[in-house]
């Protein structure tokens, strides 16, 4: 059952609700209870903004005073707490923003369980030895963590609310349809590269972050909503901007006490952008959903899979699409950008590129665009996993909300209501990976050839949690890995690539994150491949 509200898109109109494929009117009182409704309510209708702001600031002051006077929790040490003469956590948060990775690594030298004051507030950090214990503990809830960490109860952030229908659609439809999607992914990639990268055999520069994000967002959108909407620049702008704007809005909202965030969201321009993106996405999906997606396009897609899987369960297709896009675009783009820069800056880049091309041609000629080809691209798989190891998206992950007091295997007690994360630092441990700071593109080929089944990109372990761990590991990782490999096959077989400025850092550390440098550029020129493997 599809439900979404388009009531705030203009002058007052009857409320509209999808029940199956039928659009019916419903009362405003009913719609106020729907998940999307809070994103459609402009706070500007409240009578007195100045009074509201005054009340909020007074409540904030009371909250801050209460927190300052409250006794500090001292059972678990804090490694970057307040220093002498500091009031509040502002400076501690700022220090974490500048050197989060260093603070985490230093903390692990002091204790295996400790607190940090992050940009998003205090949290408990566990060493990697706790990963297997935490991943399946019934009192460690991942969905509640995501909802609390990303304000899913706050207007504009509804996209982060858990939707089991979407998880089921990914697991039962998307993953099982990878084989059928490979040729469409390849065809769309070819179209985009020809239009954006061109066919010139002369070197020319491109903004690496922009061009990869554009490519990934369109390929993903075409797979998720079909060719017509997936190629629409307005739709692509909505889904890509929602993700980037959410990161900014998240940090803005974290500056407010948690209890006041549902109110503060209406005064923050960054949060207003999120509500606008949701409204615009609803407007664009409305014609397709009202007509019936299969009637609109002559083949099934993720919209249809959601409807099939949902059955009588209620879900919101707008939130589902924005959530899917946020998960698919950022992490996929991140890994492609980092991998390309690692390939270009490898000490013997030319040989590595030729080795990759030789493997791609051999495998694709033998298997074509089939799932077996993705399995047999061993060197490409190794290159991707090595980049994810050396330059992960985050230093700590496996976020969990503790729903009741737990005692870990070593006697450590974690209280109910705490937020915990497990660090991914074994990826830099010389006892696990010799020369861990060296990017070795052949590392996981050797491990795989020696019988290490965990050497595959999509195989998460406590030693390499790039896709999480356990039942909450990324459900879309198989689709993401396939999409990334197809895109890189097109890029490396069709273009010579190099990074023009050797002095620019490839990764910027900010808090828990390792971002690709936003100023990175890539030089490309068309190769004369004359290959016949693209059909």
UniProtKB/Swiss-Prot annotation:
Entry-linked Gene3D superfamilies: Cytochrome P450 (1.10.630.10)
Keywords assigned: Heme, Iron, Membrane, Metal-binding, Monooxygenase, Oxidoreductase, Transmembrane, Transmembrane helix
A GO CC annotation recorded here is:
membrane
What are the recorded Gene Ontology BP terms? secondary metabolic process; terpenoid biosynthetic process
Q: Which residues form a coiled coil?
A: none
Write out the GO MF terms: heme binding; iron ion binding; monooxygenase activity; oxidoreductase activity, acting on paired donors, with incorporation or reduction of molecular oxygen
So which cofactors does this thing need?
heme
Ion transport recorded as keyword: no
Membrane topology, as annotated: Single-pass membrane protein
Q: Per the record's keyword annotation, is Secreted included, yes or no?
A: no
Note the SUPFAM superfamilies from the entry.
Cytochrome P450
Question: Where primarily located?
Answer: membrane
* Residues involved in heme binding: 474
User: InterPro entries, alphabetically?
Assistant: Cyt_P450, Cyt_P450_CS, Cyt_P450_E_grp-IV, Cyt_P450_sf
Q: Where in the cell is it found?
A: Membrane
Pathways involved? Secondary metabolite biosynthesis; terpenoid biosynthesis
State the EC number(s): 1.-.-.-
Outline what the protein does: Cytochrome P450 monooxygenase; part of the gene cluster B that mediates the biosynthesis of austinol and dehydroaustinol, two fungal meroterpenoids. The first step of the pathway is the synthesis of 3,5-dimethylorsellinic acid by the polyketide synthase ausA. 3,5-dimethylorsellinic acid is then prenylated by the polyprenyl transferase ausN. Further epoxidation by the FAD-dependent monooxygenase ausM and cyclization by the probable terpene cyclase ausL lead to the formation of protoaustinoid A.
The misc remark on file is: In A.calidoustus, the austinoid gene cluster lies on a contiguous DNA region, while clusters from E.nidulans and P.brasilianum are split in their respective genomes. Genetic rearrangements provoked variability among the clusters and E.nidulans produces the least number of austionoid derivatives with the end products austinol and dehydroaustinol, while P.brasilianum can produce until acetoxydehydroaustin, and A.calidoustus produces the highest number of identified derivatives.
Q: Which PANTHER family match?
A: CYTOCHROME P450 (PTHR46206), CYTOCHROME P450 MONOOXYGENASE AUSG-RELATED (PTHR46206:SF2)
Its name, as the record gives it, is Cytochrome P450 monooxygenase ausR
Give the source species. Emericella nidulans (strain FGSC A4 / ATCC 38163 / CBS 112.46 / NRRL 194 / M139) (Aspergillus nidulans)
């Amino acid at each position: 059952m599809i439900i979404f509200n388009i009531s705030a898109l203009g002058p007052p109109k009857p409320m509209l609700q999808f029940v199956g494929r039928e659009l019916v009117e419903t009362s405003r009182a009913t719609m106020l209870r729907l998940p999307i409704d809070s994103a459609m309510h402009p706070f500007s209708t409240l009578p007195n903004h100045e009074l509201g702001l005054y009340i909020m600031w007074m409540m904030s002051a009371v909250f801050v005073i209460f927190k300052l006077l409250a006794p500090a929790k001292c059972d678990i040490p804090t490694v970057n707490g307040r220093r002498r003469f500091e009031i509040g956590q502002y400076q501690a948060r700022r220090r974490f923003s500048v050197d989060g990775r260093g603070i985490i690594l230093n903390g692990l030298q002091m204790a295996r369980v400790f607190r940090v004051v992050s940009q998003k507030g205090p949290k408990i950090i566990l060493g990697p030895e706790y990963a297997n214990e935490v991943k399946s503990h019934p009192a460690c809830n991942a969905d509640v963590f995501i909802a609390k960490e990303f304000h899913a109860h706050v207007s504009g952030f509804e996209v982060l609310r858990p939707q089991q229908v979407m998880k089921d659609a990914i697991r039962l439809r998307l993953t099982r349809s990878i084989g059928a999607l490979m040729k469409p992914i390849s065809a769309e990639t070819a179209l985009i590269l020809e239009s954006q990268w061109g066919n010139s055999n002369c070197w020319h520069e491109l903004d690496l972050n922009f061009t990869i994000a554009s490519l990934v967002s369109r390929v993903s959108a075409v797979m998720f909503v079909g060719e017509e909407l997936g190629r629409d620049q307005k739709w692509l702008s909505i889904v890509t901007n929602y993700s980037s704007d959410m990161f900014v809005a998240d940090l803005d909202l974290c500056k407010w006490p948690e209890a006041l965030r549902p109110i503060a969201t209406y005064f923050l321009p960054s949060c207003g952008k999120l509500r606008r993106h949701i409204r615009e996405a609803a407007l664009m999906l409305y014609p397709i959903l009202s007509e019936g997606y299969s009637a609109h396009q002559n083949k099934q897609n993720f919209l249809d899979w959601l409807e099939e899987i949902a059955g009588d369960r209620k879900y919101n297709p707008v939130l589902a699409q924005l959530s899917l896009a946020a998960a698919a675009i950022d992490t996929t783009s991140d890994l492609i950008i980092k991998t390309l820069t690692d390939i270009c800056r490898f000490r013997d880049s030319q040989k590595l590129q030729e080795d990759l091309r030789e493997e791609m041609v051999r495998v694709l000629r033998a298997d074509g665009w089939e799932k077996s080809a993705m399995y047999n691209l061993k060197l490409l798989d190794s290159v991707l996993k090595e980049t994810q190891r050396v330059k992960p998206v985050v230093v700590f992950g496996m976020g969990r909300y503790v729903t009741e007091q737990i005692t870990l295997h070593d006697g450590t007690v974690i209280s109910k209501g705490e937020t915990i994360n497990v660090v991914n630092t074994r990826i830099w441990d010389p006892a696990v990976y010799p020369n861990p700071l060296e990017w070795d593109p052949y590392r996981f080929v050797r491990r795989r050839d020696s019988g290490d089944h965990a050497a595959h990109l999509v195989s998460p372990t406590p030693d390499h949690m790039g896709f999480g761990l356990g039942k909450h590991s990324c459900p879309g990782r198989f689709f993401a890995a396939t999409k990334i490999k197809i895109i890189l096959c097109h890029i490396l077989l069709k273009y010579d690539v190099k990074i023009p400025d050797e002095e620019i850092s490839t990764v910027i550390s900010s808090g828990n994150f390792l971002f690709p440098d936003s100023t990175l550029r890539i030089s490309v020129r068309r190769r004369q491949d004359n290959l016949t493997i693209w059909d």
